[in-house]
Every structure is written in C-alpha cells, then in structure tokens.
Swiss-Prot record:
Subcellular location: Cytoplasm
Principal location class: cytoplasm
Biological process, per Gene Ontology: arginine biosynthetic process via ornithine; L-arginine biosynthetic process
Gene assigned in the entry: argB
Cellular component GO terms, alphabetical: cytoplasm
Binding annotation for substrate: 68-69, 90, 195
Gene3D superfamilies noted in UniProt: Acetylglutamate kinase-like
Listed name of the protein: Acetylglutamate kinase
Keyword Amino-acid biosynthesis: yes
Length: 299
C-alpha cells in the first residue's frame, strides 16, 4: 500500500469511527459557547465555523452563543470609557450597556455569521432580545466586608441573568435549516437591556432546548486535578467535592456551575474543553478518546 493509499484509508477510518455518533445524535441539538478571545484569530475562527457547518451537514443542529469581552473592552477604550470589574464581571452603566449591545449584536454576531457563511453554512444572527428569546433580570451579587463581616450588595449596573428562555425563534431557524448565532443580550421585564455572561446564556439555552450537549470552549484543556492532570468525567456531586477541597477554583467555578445547572435542568451533558485546539469539539464528540471534561447529572 502506498503512502497516499494509507492516508486515504486513515481518513476513511476516521469517518467509520464517527459513524455511530452521527447516527445517535442526528436531529439533536448542540449548544456551543464560543468565546470572544478566540475570535481575534482568523484561522481559529475559520476552523470553528467549519466545525459548526460540519455538525449541521451530518444532521446535528448547532446553536452558537458567543462572547465578546475583549472586543467590548477595546471599544470602550477607543471611546475613552474606563472599565471596572467585580468578581470578573464588568460593571455596566447605561453607556457601557449601549456599547456592549453594539459590539455584541452588531459587530461580533455578524462577523461570526459571516465566517459560517464562508464555510458553506447558513446562519442567522440574533440576540436574546429577538423574539423574546431570553428574558433577564438584574444580577445581584453580595460581598462580605473582611473586617466587619457584614454582607454588602454589589451594584453591577445592567448585568443580568436569564429568568426565562422562549426557544420559538431558535426552533423556527433550525426548522428552516439555519444555524442560530446568539449574542448574550437579554431584555428585562423592567424594559432595560442587560448584558449576560455568555457561559450563563449558553447554559440556560441548552437547558431550555433539552440539548444533547453544551460545549464551553475555554482557554484551558478542561478541568484539572491538583497535579495538572485532566479530569475526563465529572458529576455535580464530584464537582461539589472538588470545589470544597480547592481543586476547582477561580474562573472555572462559574463555568462548572453553569454546566451543573444545565445538566440538572434538561441538558443531557456538558463539556468543558480547550477551544484553542484545532477542531477540539469534533475530537471530543466524534472520537473514542475524546477531549476535555464531560459533565453528566448524578445517577
């Protein structure tokens, strides 16, 4: 067998390995959170769009929820507006909220729609305000004063969290053969517009859709143990123990909280994986070895 023939055979074997997954999940929904950091790399954005179009081509219905923190920060800097963060969340006054909506819904969303179109797919860009997709309420956070131990309410401005997801607009888009691309903006019953953490938004949508998978693409290879090894499978109970003993800390905590909420509210499973790895999502789902950390509900 020639080298060329061996290469072609290897490609065929990859497809055969993936066949059971294609069959099992045809017609199911994958919700994918794509971070704003990755969008700054055209090659990575192109590969991500190709992965999404491939999922659609094999009968899976992807729904993309994107972030945009770096792009919002860059625009605020250009406009001379200073950014303030509390616990990793941007304090969002009225002016900042308007800039965030402009960047998320008007720039990033349409850029991602364009990448998918270039890869041969048909995408429809929306925000959580369109079709009353996501109703939000003001996010309330508290902090404890280290000296007095008195809890204080943090006012984050127009930062929200989802209270209700109406999937009608997503169902309509999917039925029409489209790939929904969602900006993390929601409308409050109070008439205000709220900026929502993209992980949280993706988790709420995955739960409402009863998605087969929620993928959170991050800048780490998954959930790591104290020795730096990858934890490939976790349940909510195991996650709680790892948080208590300090194995899970920092920015990974809210991501896993999102995963736990999603799998306990209707999503079949969630995956935290390294979005910097080319085609990481396909490696996780369509190969036996997988990639990243899979979270399933407790039995």
């Amino acid at each position: 067998m020639t080298a060329t023939e061996k290469t072609e055979l290897a490609k065929a074997e990859v497809l055969i390995e993936a066949l059971p997954y294609f069959q099992r999940y045809a017609g199911r929904t994958f919700v994918v959170k794509y971070g704003g950091h990755a969008m700054g790399d055209p090659k990575a954005a192109r590969e991500f769009a190709e992965d999404i179009v491939l999922l659609k081509a094999v009968g899976i219905n992807p729904v993309v929820v994107h972030g945009g923190g770096p792009q919002i920060g860059a625009m605020l800097k250009r406009l001379g507006v200073e950014s303030t963060f509390v616990d990793g969340l941007r304090v969002t006054d009225k002016a900042t909220a308007e800039v965030a909506e402009m960047v998320l819904s008007g720039a990033i969303n349409k850029e991602l729609v364009g990448w998918i179109a270039q890869a041969g797919g048909k995408a429809m860009g929306v925000s959580g305000k369109d079709g009353s997709l996501v109703t939000a309420t003001k996010l309330e956070r508290t902090t404890r004063d280290p000296e007095s131990q008195i809890e204080q309410i943090l006012d984050l401005g127009f930062v929200g969290e989802p209270t209700h997801v109406d999937t009608t607009i997503l169902d309509t888009a999917v039925s029409a053969g489209m790939i929904p691309v969602v900006a993390p903006i929601g409308a409050g019953e109070d008439g205000h517009t709220y900026n929502i953490n993209a992980d949280t938004m993706a988790g709420a949508i995955a739960a409402a859709l009863g998605a087969a998978r929620l993928f959170l693409l991050t800048a780490v290879k998954g959930v790591l143990d104290k020795q730096g090894g990858l934890l490939t499978d976790l349940t909510p109970a195991q996650i709680a123990k790892l948080k208590d003993d300090g194995t899970i800390s920092g920015g990974m905590i809210p991501k896993l909280d999102t995963c736990v909420h999603a799998v306990e509210a209707g999503c079949e499973a969630a995956v935290v994986l390294d979005g910097r790895v080319p085609h990481a999502m396909l490696l996780e789902f369509f190969t036996a070895r997988g990639a990243g950390t899979l979270i399933r509900a407790d039995d």
